[in-house]
A protein has these predicted regions:
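A short, hydrophobic C-terminal helix/tail in secreted or cell-surface proteins
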Residues: 379-383
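Carboxylate-rich, polar loop motifs that coordinate divalent cations or form catalytic acidic clusters
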Residues: 1-378
Length: 383
């Protein structure tokens, strides 16, 4: 038994050391309708305080416990069900309630009651949330902010039970995204009107940047995502200009990634700062992992013959869980999961392309005199 343990230990140490010298690959686990997901277009992802993963799709809200899905859909016969199955955004408030944005209003899931209720509050301006919800997020004061198509921005203060509506009709009522920076400034991304900011909770709103040659930064652009970076900066995604970095200290804007390898514009849909030096970029053409230190990037795409690749190239949502695993929502492929890499093992498996393994059943392997590793499978021999 002792000798067996030593052999196994040496074996794993050897494999581990060799793996460190192998170029890193990214292996994803897919969850889709085949695994119980209600629908394959994942628009929104959230991990709640209990650890459940929530996935919002075009046909239902899903709660994943690591083994199976529980699906929530509109049921006209059940008054406790959600009132709309087309999910667009998710947010957990300070009380652990899940705010669910849909293509026609907002619903709140109360875990203790396991029931949904429509957020049918009337604002001081005599308006209600009736249209498609672009985004829901909270601020440090516990207020909930809701961007709604053609209705501008809503802000709900639960302590005062007060809802305010800011139509922003002088700019555009179509807010695509927003965020609060570390200093409390609210940044707004519009559909067709670029980037704006407010330092006084929307009492006044200003376009970002001083016009140069008659045009300001992001003017006329479709801003799809704004996130706070680690170095007092914002990362801004757009439809035609890829990803830009806005330095909040100097006010300077620089483009990080605008065109792909073929010279086409990058359509950015989501951004996720994974670490101090790594920015994940979800696009219509896969994922770019951008190194903020070296300005180099890795482009990940779906592959028909690679079962560990992304399941789809149209990436709609990126989310990092508390274990630092990444959840990737796509348009056709459901959700892909990439766990944190504590140790790295390279995988060799059939891909139906040149220089890949032939056959899944490895019967024997040995090292040749020239250092090549020979593997014998049930179908062929590889080296």
């Amino acid at each position: 038994m002792k000798n067996t343990f030593c052999v196994l230990a040496c074996f794993f140490i050897t494999i581990f050391c060799q793996a460190q010298s192998v170029e890193e690959h990214y292996y994803f686990k897919n969850l889709s309708i085949r695994n119980g997901l209600s629908q394959n277009t994942v628009n929104a992802i959230l991990q709640d305080r209990k650890g459940f993963m929530w996935l919002g799709t075009k046909d239902g809200l899903n709660r994943y416990d690591g083994l199976s899905f529980r699906k929530f859909k509109h049921d006209a016969a059940n008054p406790r069900s959600i009132g709309n199955s087309f999910i667009t955004s998710l947010y957990e408030d300070f009380n652990g309630n899940i705010w669910v944005g849909t293509d026609a209003g907002v619903y709140i899931y109360y875990p203790e009651k396991e029931a949904f209720e429509e957020f049918d509050c009337q604002s001081l301006e005599k308006t209600r949330i009736e249209r498609s919800v672009s985004m829901i997020a909270g601020d440090k004061q516990g207020r909930v902010w809701i961007a709604v198509e053609a209705q501008g921005m809503f802000c709900y203060d639960a302590r005062q039970k007060l809802l305010r509506n800011y139509p922003l009709s002088e700019i555009s009522s179509n807010i695509k995204c927003f965020t609060f920076d570390s200093g409390g400034t609210l940044w707004l991304g519009f559909y067709g009107d670029g980037l704006y900011y407010s330092k006084d909770n929307l009492a006044t709103v200003h376009p970002y940047g001083s016009p140069e040659d008659g045009k300001r930064e992001f003017e006329g652009g479709v801003i799809t995502k704004i996130v706070q970076g680690n170095y007092n900066c914002l990362y801004i995604g757009s439809v035609k200009e890829g990803v830009s970095e806005l330095n909040l200290t100097s006010g300077q804007v620089r483009n990080l990634l605008a065109i792909d390898e073929s010279g086409e514009s990058i359509f950015c849909r989501d951004l996720l700062p994974y670490s101090d030096n790594e920015l994940w970029i979800g696009t219509e053409s896969g994922i770019y992992i951008y190194n903020l230190r070296t300005a180099q990037f890795i482009h990940l795409r779906a592959s028909l013959y690679d079962s560990y690749s992304l399941s789809d190239n149209a990436i709609y949502a990126l989310y990092k869980d508390r274990e630092e695993g990444l959840w990737i929502g796509s348009y056709f492929g459901g959700v892909d999961y990439y766990p944190r890499q504590y140790t790295y093992f390279a995988k060799y498996y059939p891909k139906n392309i040149a220089n890949s393994l032939h056959g899944k059943r490895v019967r024997e392997f040995c090292r040749a005199d020239d250092g090549t590793c020979l593997l014998y499978t049930s179908d062929a021999a590889d080296e």
